Design a protein with these regions (language model features):
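Helix-loop-helix hairpins and the membrane-proximal interhelical loops
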Residues: 1-69, 80-95
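Helix-loop-helix junctions within the multi-pass membrane cores of secondary transporters/permeases
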Residues: 19, 93-181
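Alpha-helical transmembrane segments of multipass membrane proteins
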Residues: 46-51, 77, 135, 169, ...
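A generic, lipid-embedded transmembrane alpha helix
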Residues: 70-79, 102
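Residues in and immediately flanking transmembrane alpha helices
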Residues: 71, 85-88, 114-115, 143
Length: 182
């Protein structure tokens, strides 16, 4: 017998179980759509960690850049400008201009996150990268938004953040083992 949805009544999940199943599906899909970007970012994280320490940044400074800036392109620009002897304001302005593209990314995603609370929007915007934008914009375009779709977005953000910082740490370690990287 069906409950009117086409799903046999015996197979229908209770609301809480259905919610958990949908949440799990969102998290898994967030990982699935982000994984190719994680693979692509890995060598750049290693290179950044190795080059930054080779340029004279302390390993904690290098790790802090990845932890708090979390913008590979800005981080590479920053270490390049540091190597050239640029001042702090020059580095700040260059990385700000470079990252202005994120305002366009954010504007494109507003229709999908507008309904979320301010704390949710803050966390998602703080983790907005080229990769998370590409993954989520494509997903939202294909599937639209629904009650739990922001969990796929959060999974994309967290997985890219952890991925970038893991590979940066590996690069810091590897860079300390290889001489002549300057």
């Amino acid at each position: 017998m069906s409950d009117g949805t086409g799903v046999p009544a015996a197979a229908a999940l209770p609301p809480a179980a259905s919610h958990r199943a949908q949440l799990r599906a969102e998290v898994l899909d967030g990982l699935k759509i982000t994984f190719p970007f994680m693979v692509g970012a890995a060598p750049f994280g290693v290179i950044f960690g190795a080059l930054a320490t080779a340029q004279g940044l302390h390993p904690l400074e290098t790790a802090s850049l990845s932890l708090f800036v979390f913008s590979g392109s800005a981080q590479f620009v920053a270490i390049s400008l540091l190597a050239l002897g640029a001042g702090g304001w020059t580095i700040w302005l260059a990385t700000l201009i470079l990252n202005l593209r994120h305002t366009l990314y954010a504007a494109a995603l507003v229709p999908y996150v507008r309904h979320l609370s301010l704390p949710w929007r803050f966390v998602l915007s703080a983790g907005l990268t080229d990769e998370t934008f590409a993954a989520m914009e494509d997903r939202y375009r294909r599937l639209g938004k629904h009650e739990l779709s922001h969990w796929a977005y959060l999974t994309s953000v967290v997985s890219m953040y952890l991925n970038w910082n893991f590979w940066t740490a590996l690069g810091i370690f590897a860079g300390s083992q290889v001489k002549g990287l300057e």
